[in-house]
């Protein structure tokens, strides 16, 4: 992986499962890692950027712990103001949603889950592009000796380009986990991982109704049968930003009626 940098100089790092003892109960596959977000204030406490991605998450599906210390460790020239944690709902929302709205209803804990993403690094989503552009314009117009922010945009073609290689890496993690149950978060893990082993390519292919949502399916991967539970992306389940109200409603009902083991 090339070296990429966040605003104010933190290097992009891979975010992968670190607690790798086997015999996990469930393997969870998402899309790409999130980031630590800061609010950027000028020296008069005026907000320059409400939420600026400034570092890789400290752990996969991070839930926001220690955000103050992470941001305090990022140095910023005094003339450029200061960084403070972004609004509470902007650090660790996917991790919190995964724990509260996916794992707990299924009877699992984070400690007994092996977590994985199709892309094990942060990417810039459309909402961040404007913030990154503003940072780059500010630091290139003056002599602050800060690196230009270069975190790549999220591009589904990157998933396609690396799909075969990542498939093998994900299978290796799956086998190392010892889990026999797989939870897939949204369309992209189905299209760019599961489709190597199954004809379906998106969540609605498993059923497009409340009755079919969240059902368990037996799928063979490299000669071993796994219980696969395809669910919506945490963004939808937790109604984070732009989301599908239909999937959100189906997920809420699934929690109430089908989520328990």
State where each predicted segment sits.
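C-terminal capping/extension of enzyme domains
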Residues: 1-10, 49-60, 128-171, 190-261
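Short, well-ordered beta-to-alpha junction loops that form the rim of enzyme active sites
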Residues: 31-33, 118, 184-189
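Short, active-site-adjacent cap segments at secondary-structure transitions
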Residues: 35-36, 122, 189-192
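Proline-aspartate-enriched helix->loop->beta-strand connector
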Residues: 170-190
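Short, surface-exposed acidic-centric catalytic microdomains
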Residues: 61-63, 67-68, 92-151
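Short, flexible loop/turn elements at secondary-structure junctions
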Residues: 30-33, 120-122, 232-235
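Active-site and ligand/interface coordination hotspots across diverse enzymes
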Residues: 1-106, 169-177, 217-224, 250-261
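Hydrophobic/aromatic beta-strand patches that form the interior of the parallel beta-sheet core
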Residues: 27-29, 114-116, 181-183, 227-229
